[in-house]
Regions:
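Phosphate-binding and adjacent anionic-ligand microenvironments
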Residues: 21-182, 188-212
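Short Gly/Thr/Asp-enriched flexible loops that form oxyanion-binding sites at enzyme active sites
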Residues: 1-13, 39-40
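A conserved helix-loop-strand patch within extracytoplasmic ligand-binding domains
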Residues: 14-22
Length: 212
């Protein structure tokens, strides 16, 4: 209604309302590693567990079957249903589930308006060769573990690091000769601090992160 674009991670959090309410504590919803912490927190507030998964529809499809997840989603917009569907990303089926929710008085615009304000970057690509992108991840990983507690670092798919400002991500693209960067702060100032941290880490590896 408001003409706003809704990213796939937040749309997945909204669609979690369509999952059957029984045994929520035993059901895990998957979001890919690029997803907002707001989406994770919202899913957990509904009584589900939330799991960070690798980006890529093949990775998500594999994981949804492994843990019998009722729902998974990527920031890019791929939505996977495993409760009453086959566990793969079907845009038409996702649209039907969305329309079913709205027909039952779950309105997407109202849901989005209840979420805390997010200060999140777009997905930023830093182009470099495959050799360089994996070497860069390895080099930055060593520096990260010298600075951060291991509990604040996820290495499932690149590096996702949490700190007092929010979180940042550097990962190797699955489809391009590029690194993918994203960060989300608790305020505009925090987002800028995260940007500068990632920019300096990449600069030390001879790579440039342009202003977004």
């Amino acid at each position: 209604k408001q003409g706003r674009s809704v990213a796939g991670d937040l749309l997945t959090a909204f669609l979690a309302n369509s999952i059957a309410t029984n045994n929520k504590n035993n059901q895990t919803i998957i979001l890919d590693i690029k997803s907002s912490y707001v989406a994770y927190e919202n899913i957990m507030s509904l009584g589900f567990k939330a799991e960070i998964g690798k980006t890529g529809h093949s990775n998500i499809k594999k994981r949804i079957k492994e843990i019998k997840s009722p729902l998974a989603g990527e920031m890019s917009g791929h939505i996977f249903f495993g409760d009453t569907y086959f566990g793969y990303d079907d845009a038409l089926y996702a649209a039907i589930r969305l329309l079913t929710l709205t027909a039952n008085n779950f309105e997407l615009d109202k849901f989005i308006s209840t979420l805390p304000e997010t200060f999140v970057s777009p997905e930023i690509k830093v182009f470099c060769s495959d050799e360089i992108k994996f070497l860069t991840i390895d080099n930055i990983s060593k520096k990260v573990f010298e600075k951060y507690n291991s509990n604040d670092v996820i290495t499932l798919d690149g590096l996702r690091v949490k700190n007092n400002h929010g979180w940042w991500l550097i990962r190797a693209s699955n489809t391009e000769e590029a690194l993918v960067v994203r960060f989300e702060g608790k305020s505009e100032k925090s987002k800028k601090e995260l940007f500068l941290e990632v920019k300096n880490l990449l600069k030390n590896e001879g790579l440039t992160l342009d202003n977004y």
